[in-house]
């Protein structure tokens, strides 16, 4: 064989992979367990703001989506949930702890419901975002509240904040770990149950907005 020629047989034996290996390659799963493929968003208005189209192995992007305004809409939704757990001063910056909490919570969700935890989390976020809120109108002297529609991005932001706040408050001075409380909060919110802190807060916000129409 001359210097410029390539041994095709030698190359092809490396290019052709076994079928079971090919099946595994190309399907990125969260924590190498949970698939994004069958997850659906049941609210058409939130499809552009709940990011599940580009699967990731870990919910960590090193602040890539914080550089520009509104870019967080493209941040994977599980990463946004994880970031929201890093609150309350003493937890600031403890990303590894937050990732472990979410991973443990997802295991618990799967054991309790036998469903894909990503689907449960997406359903919880869809159910917890308030559609209507009230804002203050007027200056100094006369201030009144006026009902306003909530944008899809703010609905997602508020839903995530309410879910993580509910889990944090439930685990405070409780024998249950925060992972267990987060799992319970997500399951109740996905069902639309009034046992969920986030659902109760959402209903309260919408009730106040309705009275100020």
Swiss-Prot record:
Cellular-component GO terms for this entry: cytosolic small ribosomal subunit; ribosome
A biological process from GO: translation
GO MF term set: mRNA binding; rRNA binding; structural constituent of ribosome
UniProt keyword list: Cytoplasm, Ribonucleoprotein, Ribosomal protein
InterPro entries referenced in this protein's UniProt entry, alphabetically: Ribosomal_uS7 (IPR000235), Ribosomal_uS7_CS (IPR020606), Ribosomal_uS7_dom (IPR023798), Ribosomal_uS7_dom_sf (IPR036823), Ribosomal_uS7_euk/arc (IPR005716)
Subcellular location: Cytoplasm
Keyword Electron transport: no
SUPFAM superfamilies: Ribosomal protein S7 (SSF47973)
A Pfam entry, by short name: Ribosomal_S7
Quaternary structure (record): Component of the small ribosomal subunit (SSU). Mature N.crassa ribosomes consist of a small (40S) and a large (60S) subunit. The 40S small subunit contains 1 molecule of ribosomal RNA (18S rRNA) and at least 32 different proteins. The large 60S subunit contains 3 rRNA molecules (26S, 5.8S and 5S rRNA) and at least 42 different proteins.
PANTHER family: RIBOSOMAL PROTEIN S7
Described purpose of this protein according to its UniProt entry: Component of the ribosome, a large ribonucleoprotein complex responsible for the synthesis of proteins in the cell. The small ribosomal subunit (SSU) binds messenger RNAs (mRNAs) and translates the encoded message by selecting cognate aminoacyl-transfer RNA (tRNA) molecules. The large subunit (LSU) contains the ribosomal catalytic site termed the peptidyl transferase center (PTC), which catalyzes the formation of peptide bonds, thereby polymerizing the amino acids delivered by tRNAs into a polypeptide chain.
Family membership noted in the UniProt record: Belongs to the universal ribosomal protein uS7 family.
Protein name (Swiss-Prot/TrEMBL): Small ribosomal subunit protein uS7
Source organism per UniProt: Neurospora crassa (strain ATCC 24698 / 74-OR23-1A / CBS 708.71 / DSM 1257 / FGSC 987)
């Amino acid at each position: 064989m001359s210097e410029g020629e390539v041994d095709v047989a030698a190359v092809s034996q490396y290019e052709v992979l076994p079928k079971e290996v090919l099946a595994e390659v190309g399907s990125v799963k969260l924590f190498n367990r949970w698939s994004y493929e069958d997850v659906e968003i049941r609210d058409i208005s939130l499809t552009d703001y709940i990011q599940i189209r580009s699967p990731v192995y870990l919910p960590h992007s090193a602040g890539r989506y914080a550089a520009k305004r509104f870019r967080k809409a493209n941040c994977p939704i599980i990463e946004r949930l994880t970031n929201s757990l890093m609150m309350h001063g003493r937890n600031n910056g403890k990303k590894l702890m937050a990732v472990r909490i979410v991973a443990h919570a997802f295991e618990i969700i799967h054991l309790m419901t036998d469903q894909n935890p990503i689907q449960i989390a997406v359903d919880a976020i869809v159910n917890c975002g308030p559609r209507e809120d009230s804002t203050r109108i007027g200056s100094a002297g006369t201030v009144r509240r006026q009902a306003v529609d909530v944008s899809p991005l703010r609905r997602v932001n508020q839903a995530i904040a309410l879910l993580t706040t509910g889990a944090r408050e439930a685990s405070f001075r409780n024998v249950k770990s925060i992972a267990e409380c987060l799992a319970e909060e997500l399951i109740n919110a996905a069902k639309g149950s009034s046992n969920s802190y986030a659902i109760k807060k959402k209903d309260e916000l919408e009730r106040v907005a309705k009275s100020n129409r």
